[in-house]
Protein backbone atom coordinates (compact mmCIF):
# COMPACT_ATOMS: atom_id res chain seq x y z
CA UNK A 1 0.00 0.00 0.00
CA UNK A 2 1.31 3.43 -0.92
CA UNK A 3 1.43 5.85 1.97
CA UNK A 4 -0.08 9.23 1.13
CA UNK A 5 1.99 12.35 1.54
CA UNK A 6 1.71 16.12 1.17
CA UNK A 7 4.09 18.91 0.17
CA UNK A 8 5.04 19.95 3.70
CA UNK A 9 5.91 16.38 4.66
CA UNK A 10 7.91 15.87 1.45
CA UNK A 11 9.92 19.04 2.19
CA UNK A 12 10.54 17.97 5.80
CA UNK A 13 11.57 14.48 4.62
CA UNK A 14 14.00 16.00 2.09
CA UNK A 15 15.74 18.32 4.53
CA UNK A 16 16.04 15.49 7.04
CA UNK A 17 17.50 13.20 4.34
CA UNK A 18 20.04 15.95 3.58
CA UNK A 19 21.22 15.85 7.20
CA UNK A 20 19.58 19.01 8.49
CA UNK A 21 19.24 18.77 12.26
CA UNK A 22 18.19 22.32 13.23
CA UNK A 23 15.80 24.90 11.76
CA UNK A 24 14.78 28.35 12.97
CA UNK A 25 11.26 29.70 12.62
CA UNK A 26 8.43 31.89 13.72
CA UNK A 27 5.47 29.58 13.11
CA UNK A 28 3.04 30.96 10.56
CA UNK A 29 -0.19 29.78 8.99
CA UNK A 30 1.24 30.06 5.48
CA UNK A 31 3.47 27.01 6.05
CA UNK A 32 1.61 24.91 8.64
CA UNK A 33 1.94 21.74 6.52
CA UNK A 34 5.74 22.08 6.74
CA UNK A 35 5.55 22.44 10.52
CA UNK A 36 3.43 19.28 10.63
CA UNK A 37 6.07 17.53 8.52
CA UNK A 38 8.85 18.73 10.82
CA UNK A 39 6.91 17.41 13.81
CA UNK A 40 7.11 13.95 12.25
CA UNK A 41 10.92 14.28 12.50
CA UNK A 42 11.05 15.76 16.01
CA UNK A 43 13.65 13.17 17.05
CA UNK A 44 15.97 14.25 14.21
CA UNK A 45 15.29 17.93 13.52
CA UNK A 46 15.31 20.49 16.32
CA UNK A 47 12.88 23.34 15.62
CA UNK A 48 14.02 26.56 17.32
CA UNK A 49 10.95 28.77 17.72
CA UNK A 50 11.87 32.45 17.64
CA UNK A 51 9.91 35.50 18.73
CA UNK A 52 10.61 37.48 15.57
CA UNK A 53 11.53 36.64 11.99
CA UNK A 54 14.64 38.82 12.16
CA UNK A 55 15.85 36.61 15.01
CA UNK A 56 15.15 33.44 13.02
CA UNK A 57 17.02 34.77 9.98
CA UNK A 58 19.97 36.03 12.02
CA UNK A 59 20.21 32.73 13.90
CA UNK A 60 20.12 30.77 10.63
CA UNK A 61 22.78 33.07 9.15
CA UNK A 62 25.00 32.62 12.22
CA UNK A 63 24.44 28.85 12.15
CA UNK A 64 25.61 28.73 8.54
CA UNK A 65 28.60 30.94 9.26
CA UNK A 66 29.70 28.96 12.32
CA UNK A 67 29.02 25.40 11.15
CA UNK A 68 29.61 25.67 7.40
CA UNK A 69 26.27 23.92 6.82
CA UNK A 70 23.32 25.94 5.55
CA UNK A 71 21.29 27.59 8.28
CA UNK A 72 17.61 26.98 7.59
CA UNK A 73 14.88 29.51 8.39
CA UNK A 74 11.13 29.29 7.83
CA UNK A 75 9.23 32.58 7.84
CA UNK A 76 5.74 33.60 6.86
CA UNK A 77 4.81 35.66 3.84
CA UNK A 78 4.80 39.44 3.62
CA UNK A 79 5.90 40.93 6.94
CA UNK A 80 7.77 37.76 7.91
CA UNK A 81 9.89 37.95 4.78
CA UNK A 82 10.45 41.68 5.30
CA UNK A 83 11.61 41.12 8.86
CA UNK A 84 13.97 38.35 7.74
CA UNK A 85 15.52 40.50 5.01
CA UNK A 86 18.43 41.83 7.11
CA UNK A 87 19.55 38.30 8.03
CA UNK A 88 19.22 37.27 4.39
CA UNK A 89 21.24 40.30 3.28
CA UNK A 90 23.92 39.58 5.89
CA UNK A 91 24.20 35.99 4.65
CA UNK A 92 24.60 37.22 1.09
CA UNK A 93 27.21 39.84 2.01
CA UNK A 94 29.22 37.42 4.17
CA UNK A 95 28.71 34.38 1.89
CA UNK A 96 27.14 32.45 4.77
CA UNK A 97 25.32 29.30 3.66
CA UNK A 98 21.64 29.89 4.35
CA UNK A 99 18.30 28.67 3.01
CA UNK A 100 15.13 30.60 3.74
CA UNK A 101 11.70 29.16 3.08
CA UNK A 102 9.02 31.84 2.84
CA UNK A 103 5.32 31.04 3.09
CA UNK A 104 3.18 32.14 0.18
CA UNK A 105 -0.41 32.92 -0.67
CA UNK A 106 -2.43 30.37 -2.63
CA UNK A 107 -1.46 30.45 -6.30
CA UNK A 108 -5.01 31.30 -7.39
CA UNK A 109 -4.69 34.64 -5.54
CA UNK A 110 -1.22 35.51 -6.82
CA UNK A 111 -0.86 38.89 -8.49
CA UNK A 112 -4.13 40.19 -7.05
CA UNK A 113 -2.83 42.07 -3.98
CA UNK A 114 -3.91 39.20 -1.73
CA UNK A 115 -3.42 39.30 2.04
CA UNK A 116 0.25 40.06 2.76
CA UNK A 117 1.27 39.36 -0.84
CA UNK A 118 4.79 40.50 -1.72
CA UNK A 119 6.69 40.13 -4.99
CA UNK A 120 9.82 38.48 -3.60
CA UNK A 121 11.81 38.86 -6.82
CA UNK A 122 11.33 42.64 -6.66
CA UNK A 123 11.88 42.72 -2.90
CA UNK A 124 15.09 40.70 -2.74
CA UNK A 125 16.34 41.38 -6.26
CA UNK A 126 17.78 39.09 -8.84
CA UNK A 127 19.68 36.88 -8.41
CA UNK A 128 17.89 35.57 -5.37
CA UNK A 129 20.93 33.51 -4.46
CA UNK A 130 24.67 33.74 -4.52
CA UNK A 131 26.79 30.87 -5.78
Protein language model features and the residues they cover:
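N-terminal alpha/beta PP-like core and its mobile active-site loop of ThDP/TPP-dependent enzymes
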Residues: 1-131
Amino acid sequence: MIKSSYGGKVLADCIRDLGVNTVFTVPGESFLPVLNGLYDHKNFIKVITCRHESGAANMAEAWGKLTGFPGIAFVTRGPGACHASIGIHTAMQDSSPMIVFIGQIHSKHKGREAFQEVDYIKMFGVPFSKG
